[in-house]
């Protein structure tokens, strides 16, 4: 079934005729209540975070951007408010210091599949499995809003460690970005895909915040705390490349 509109009466009527026992939602937009309330045992959702942390559209990205050392998946009963339903199962996954969102996404995809199957097994064993309200958890809810041009831009008035996490949390897609100017040339826009932190370098009169510092093979920016070395970047309209290759091309012009 693939309706043009989820509230389409012919679609809803067809679902009623199927008499579904359980609804399952994975990586899909909000369903209208007339759809998710229809299955006899309700509808469950798989979410890419340890709820109530990171409710919203981009939970995997924001967990890494915020420097979390652990994330996971949650299955829960669907209700009106986004990602607030009673929790059925959770599974945890560590985040290593250099993991990016691409790697964690792929690992959570497999973990999520296992957790979803285990959740369905709960309903096979008991048509009313225990589910815990999110308000019972001693954890403050946090949000994972939609990624935009504004919240993916790198700003040099932040510490290098935070910017590094932002790059990891957006790589390879949609990618953090910045605008840099080389030797007074027109500013260029880049996607930034891999970075390293040099935390001992503080702003100074010689290297103020936001200054570009070029080595023979390195490209660094002075931040509010430490320097951020850009190791892999992607100029607009070109393929991703090591910063050293970009610098070689820049100097050969």
Model-derived segments and spans:
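An anion-binding loop in the catalytic cleft
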Residues: 151, 156-253
């Amino acid at each position: 079934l693939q309706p043009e509109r989820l509230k389409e009466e012919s679609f809803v009527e067809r679902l009623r005729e199927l008499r579904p026992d359980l609804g399952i939602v994975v990586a899909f937009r909000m369903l209208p209540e007339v759809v998710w309330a229809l299955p006899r045992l309700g509808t469950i959702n798989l979410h890419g975070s340890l709820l109530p942390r990171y409710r919203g559209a981009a939970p995997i990205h924001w967990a890494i951007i915020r420097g979390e050392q652990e994330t996971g998946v949650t299955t829960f009963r669907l209700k009106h408010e986004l990602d607030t339903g009673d929790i059925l199962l959770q599974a945890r996954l560590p985040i290593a210091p250099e993991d990016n969102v691409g790697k964690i996404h792929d690992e959570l995809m497999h973990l999520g599949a296992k957790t979803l199957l285990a959740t369905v097994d709960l309903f096979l064993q008991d048509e009313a499995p225990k589910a815990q309200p999110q308000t019972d958890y001693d954890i403050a809810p946090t949000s994972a809003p939609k990624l935009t041009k504004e919240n993916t831009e790198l700003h040099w008035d932040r510490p290098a460690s935070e910017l590094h996490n932002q790059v990891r949390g957006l790589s390879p897609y949609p990618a953090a970005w910045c605008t840099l100017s080389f030797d007074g040339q027109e500013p260029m826009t880049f996607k930034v895909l891999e970075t390293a932190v040099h935390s001992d370098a503080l702003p100074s009169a010689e290297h103020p915040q936001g200054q570009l510092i070029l080595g023979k093979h390195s490209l660094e920016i002075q931040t509010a705390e430490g320097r951020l070395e850009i190791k892999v970047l992607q100029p607009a309209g070109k393929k991703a490349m090591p910063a050293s290759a970009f610098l070689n091309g820049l100097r050969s012009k």
